Amino acid sequence: MLLLELKKINQTLETIHFIGIGGVGMSGIAEILHNLGYKVQGSDLVENYNTKRLESYGIKIFLGHVPQNITNVSYVVISSAINPDNPEIQEALERKIPIIRRAEMLAELMRLKCSVAVSGSHGKTTTTSLVACLFEAAGLCPTVINGGIINNRSTNAYLGSSNYLIAEADESDATFIHIPSTIAIITNIDPEHLDYYKDFATLISAFRSFIINLPFYGFAVCCIDHKIVRKLVDDITERKIVTYGIDSADAHIIAFNINTDIASSTFDVKISLPNVLGTTIIEKITIPIPGRHNILNSLAAIAVGIELDFGIKAIKNGFNNFKGVKRRFTKVAEYNMASIIDDYAHHPEEIKATLATAKNIANKQNGKVIAIFQPHRYSRMQHLFDDFMLCFADADILYITDIYAAGENPIEGITGQSLVDKITKNKYHDQANFLATLDDAVGVIIDNAVSGDVIIMMGAGNISSFANELPKKFGNL
């Protein structure tokens, strides 16, 4: 779709239909288009938080995918998660209704603004949210399209009044390299989405294109604590790159004097920008979220703020006003004075970061870490099986459920039980257990939780809904 076409859509008569509108990325774009005045509707298999939110704005939502849903639509938007044999896609093809990919529609929205695109294997959603908070503190009300619910706004997308747009750029299918951004952030690069890229080198090459495609006046912000990102940065001379880290003494922006607890992280920052003489120290920056990985995420936001001259006061105020992101180390309940945390971690690197944060907190409270993990997708487990065996070291007690399929067919030999068996056989963890059902987690918590413990419920499936229902379940005992 050309930019002129987006502008020429008749906002009164022409309807844009989203297939899978309940997805985080799709719902965000639908909301922005609705707020811009376009006529939007969509369908999804089940009702969820996002569909309910969109309905409350007056957007028509169909439950189920049937050809009749697109009877009077002019454009259809799909994501890579939608199968080509979807009946609504087939109907659109039959009727020659233009089918637009989610990333293409995002690109059209970004072309209208000066855009910040946040990508990387992990940390995109939190980083996007932190960047947005700094823009707002600087008096620039940005348009934001995020991959998770921003607690400050109770939504993952909102329309701003300034000429800036901040978006999470999904790297899963390489469409992110076509996003017309002015500022690009790369948090890290791990071997994910290899079902699409086929090999790690191709994925790394896509991130290189993500930077090279920036305009000459733009810049990239990259975490060189991650060795793959460091190598990528070292090989690029065509674009300006600002680096950050905790362990990298040569980074332009470095965090030190770090202290974390269950609710926040405090640290100092040293800034030594390229082509700028001298260094600047910012003392006692506080972010209301724990964890070393979140400090790194905040450094990316600081890099953008410093480059755009937001000022130290705006940076500190922006972080002070940040209320976190749904499902990112979110405390949902307490039992026997033990904290129960809901977290989206579903990749081995994310799990390690989340458990390291939990371990640090539990140690300060003389408690232990109880991890309850629901694997997500058979294909991910198959590709990263060896990494999954090694990522739970910081859990004192580990429970693993069966795999949440997310629409995939089972793969022989790839199960939650097989992961537990291999972990136990190889002595990677001496208290790894298989959890037959999520309901059994209630008994696990009752039997094991004591004061000071941190109970982490992790995964990208329905474990979050279960975790949020725990207060009710405990109340019914």
Curated annotation (Swiss-Prot):
* Enzymatic reactions: UDP-N-acetyl-alpha-D-muramate + L-alanine + ATP = UDP-N-acetyl-alpha-D-muramoyl-L-alanine + ADP + phosphate + H(+)
Give GO BP annotations, semicolon-separated.
Answer: cell division; cell wall organization; peptidoglycan biosynthetic process; regulation of cell shape
Keyword match Nucleotide-binding: yes
Localization of this protein: Cytoplasm
- Metabolic or biological pathway: Cell wall biogenesis; peptidoglycan biosynthesis
S-S pairs:
none
InterPro entries tied to this protein: Mur-like_cat_sf (IPR036565), Mur_ligase_C (IPR004101), Mur_ligase_C_dom_sf (IPR036615), Mur_ligase_cen (IPR013221), Mur_ligase_N (IPR000713), MurCDEF_pg_biosynth (IPR050061), UDP-N-AcMur_Ala_ligase_MurC (IPR005758)
GO-annotated cellular components = cytoplasm
Q: Where is the signal peptide?
A: none
State a single Pfam family of this protein. Mur_ligase
Q: Which residues form a coiled coil?
A: none
Which UniProt keywords are listed?
ATP-binding, Cell cycle, Cell division, Cell shape, Cell wall biogenesis/degradation, Cytoplasm, Ligase, Nucleotide-binding, Peptidoglycan synthesis
What EC number is given for this enzyme?
Answer: 6.3.2.8
Q: Which residues bind ATP?
A: G120, S121, H122, G123, K124, T125, T126
Select a single GO molecular function from the record's annotations and give it. ATP binding
The entry sums up its family as follows: Belongs to the MurCDEF family.
Any idea what job this protein has?
Cell wall formation.
For this entry, the protein name equals UDP-N-acetylmuramate--L-alanine ligase
This protein's species is: Rickettsia canadensis (strain McKiel)
